[in-house]
Amino acid sequence: MTGSVWAIVPAAGRGTRFGGAVPKQYLHAAGQPLMAYTLAALAAHPAVAGIVVAIAPDDADWPGWTAVHAKPLLTCVGGATRAASVLAGLLALPDGVRADDFVLVHDAARPNLALADLDRLLEIGRGDPVGAILAAPVRDTLKRAGDDGGIDGTEPRQRLWRALTPQLFRRHQLIRGLTEASAAGVDVTDEAMAIERLGLRPLLVEGAEDNFKVTTPADLARFEFELANRDRGGASREAERSAMPSAATSVFSGARSAASGSEEV
């Protein structure tokens, strides 16, 4: 299936698990905000028509970008939860996005997305009536903990996967899934969970293990290490990440650069 898709990036969260005054999506790696790499990676795919970023109502860190890779970059006010922010993004999509069009949702603090993974997700997901998510098979041994901190047992890891992003679903089905979950008081932790509650079965598309979410200082250090390797030409997947240069903000335009304050960045 061909055609363009829009992407939604929920970025209204405060990143409390990371700590600090600055939300994690705005923390800098190699001099640029994490979210700059995230948005640049999404917009680099030829099938992505534009991106809606859901930000906090009092967000003073948003750089004011209006385009990335010459594609429109819109904002809307997000909600108190991830699900509320994604729903706000779905409702803020341009009028030309139809109810049955596929839409991508990607974590703001997941900056290491490879173009090849996104390409595979779009190819497989748009060929399915429901959609698909990037995911990685669980490879570690899983232990079930007791209340006292002891091991109560070992869980079989066969057929278990870690959900990654982006996730790809039809706009109207995701709106329905998120709305019904909210009405039922269910806190869905990803978009696939909302779709599953409708009785639908998205596909799993294997993605790279290094498409990780930055949630701790160690994760940030790991991403900076990836960037340093890329600069030295030592990253094995550099060809797949050609749209994510170290100076990620060079592909942005808008009100100001988070790094330089310039009109074009």
Curated annotation (Swiss-Prot):
It catalyses: 2-C-methyl-D-erythritol 4-phosphate + CTP + H(+) = 4-CDP-2-C-methyl-D-erythritol + diphosphate. Pfam families: IspD. Residues 231-265 are annotated as: Disordered. The record marks 157, 213 as: Positions MEP for the nucleophilic attack. Gene3D superfamilies: Spore Coat Polysaccharide Biosynthesis Protein SpsA, Chain A. Its EC number is 2.7.7.60. It comes from the Bacteria. The keyword Nucleotidyltransferase applies. Residues 231-241 have a biased composition (Basic and acidic residues). Residues 253-265 have a biased composition (Low complexity). SUPFAM superfamilies: Nucleotide-diphospho-sugar transferases. This is 2-C-methyl-D-erythritol 4-phosphate cytidylyltransferase. It comes from Xanthomonas campestris pv. campestris (strain B100). The gene is ispD.
